[in-house]
Amino acid sequence: YRRYQTYVRNYAGNQPINKICCGPNVDDYEWTKKVMATFFDHCDPKLHGLMDGLSLHYYTLPETEDDWNIKGSATDFTEDIFYQTLKRGYFMEELINRHGAIMDEYDPDKNIGLIVDEWGIWSDVEPGTNPGFLYQQNTMRDALVAGMTLNIFNKHSDRVKMACIAQLINVLQSVMLTDGDKMIKTPTYYVFHMMRHHQGAALLDSSLVGGATVGSGKNELPKVFESVSEDKDGVITVTLTNNSLESSEDVDIMLTNEGDKYSVSEARYIEGAMDAHNTFEAPEVVDEKNFTAFENTQTGVKVTLPAC
């Protein structure tokens, strides 16, 4: 990397090159430690390690943690596997926290972005398709992993500067599927669409009180995930996921700017069975809808999140 960054130079001052160093695979914290130490031990701190980003690579495998030959079906899975998949998706929070803590030792001002270069569910390819093309279906399980992960990224946006779901169309946890001249939107597409209002906005501090969980044993994880932002016009966006297959969740959103009055201008959601997915024959099984299960309160808004 030192050789690379030496010869890749900023020739256009108004178009700076962002240099991203190859970072850890999943939980290889020693790699992060050695990379940061190597660069900062021989570099003026103002140059933040001669890098603008450090990559992080993590996929969610539904059935096995390390056997890439048995990843599990994209559409045919049990409730136990559903929660196991969500718990493995939730591991992204720990990865960001622990790699971020190491980066903080050397880069407390967070000049170096953590670049999550590949993330998402990686399941078995669809039967009858070319294994090399990595074509898989996309269900409400994918949507919840996407929503949970994007909320995690949002809440760590001071360190996570870029993240790339793998991949956009027809490969792994994609947002679109095509067949010739046909194209359908996946449940993951709608998650990205609903969360678009966070783009360009400022993150607001938020937290959940109550501690409800879903799953059990090693697959237990928080029931609700959230993130909140405010745009330049003062519009606040709140995104929430309910990871439960069984029960809805009442959430009383309290906004703390004293004296301000808030009302809901738009509310959208998706829901469906855990294996609900769109096909070319039925392209709108999972679709974005108007959300009406809310009421304005003196301090914000109260919502009832449906189960998956």
What label would you give each PLM region?
Residues 42-43, 101-106, 149-153, 180, ...:
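Generic recognition of flexible, low-complexity loop/linker segments
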Residues 58, 167, 271:
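Residues that line or immediately flank small-molecule/substrate-binding pockets and catalytic motifs
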Residues 1-147, 209-219:
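Noncatalytic carbohydrate-binding groove/subsite architecture in carbohydrate-active enzymes
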Residues 20-21, 55, 115-116, 164, ...:
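Structured core elements
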Residues 68, 111-235:
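Aromatic/acidic polysaccharide-binding cleft in carbohydrate-active enzymes
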Residues 207-221, 233, 241-308:
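C-terminal beta-sandwich/jelly-roll accessory domains of carbohydrate-active enzymes
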Residues 15-16, 49-50, 159, 263, ...:
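Short loop/turn motifs at secondary-structure junctions
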Residues 64, 173, 248:
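Glycine/Thr-rich phosphate-binding loops of Rossmann-like dinucleotide-binding domains
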